[in-house]
UniProtKB/Swiss-Prot annotation:
Post-translational modification: The N-terminus is blocked.
Induction: By carcinogenic agents and by UV light. During squamous differentiation of epidermal keratinocytes.
Chain's role: Cross-linked envelope protein of keratinocytes. It is a keratinocyte protein that first appears in the cell cytosol, but ultimately becomes cross-linked to membrane proteins by transglutaminase. All that results in the formation of an insoluble envelope beneath the plasma membrane. Can function as both amine donor and acceptor in transglutaminase-mediated cross-linkage.
Chain segments carrying region 2 X 12 AA approximate repeats: 3-29
Any one GO molecular-function label of the UniProt entry: structural molecule activity
Main localization of the protein described in the UniProt heading: cytoplasm
Reported tissue expression: Suprabasal layers of squamous-differentiated tissues such as epidermis, esophagus, tongue and trachea.
Protein name in the entry: Cornifin-B
Coiled coil location: none
Organism: Homo sapiens (Human)
BP terms from Gene Ontology: epidermis development; keratinization; keratinocyte differentiation; peptide cross-linking
One GO term describing the cellular component: cornified envelope
């Protein structure tokens, strides 16, 4: 009986030791991987976003908006009174 008891406690210690060695090996490679992806992501997003948005948005919006609004306005107002004159005749 004593021989069986000695075998049981002997088998679990080696298994636990193997698992402990594998666990610390896995986290180190994962840790350096996370910061690497964050570093290139942050600088790439703000750099192209800021210069691209204000440059094309500001010049394109005010230029085509101002000339388009006054042009169609007078053309629509002129036919309105013209039609009224023909009806009065």
């Amino acid at each position: 009986m004593s021989s069986q008891q000695q075998k049981q406690p002997c088998t679990p210690p080696p298994q636990l030791q193997q698992q402990q060695v594998k666990q610390p090996c896995q986290p180190p490679p994962q840790e350096p991987c996370i910061p690497k992806t964050k570093e290139p992501c942050h600088p790439k997003v703000p750099e192209p976003c800021h210069p691209k948005v204000p440059e094309p948005c500001q010049p394109k919006v005010p230029e085509p908006c101002h000339p388009k609004v006054p042009e169609p306005c007078p053309s629509i107002v002129t036919p309105a009174p013209a039609q009224q004159k023909t009806k009065q005749k």
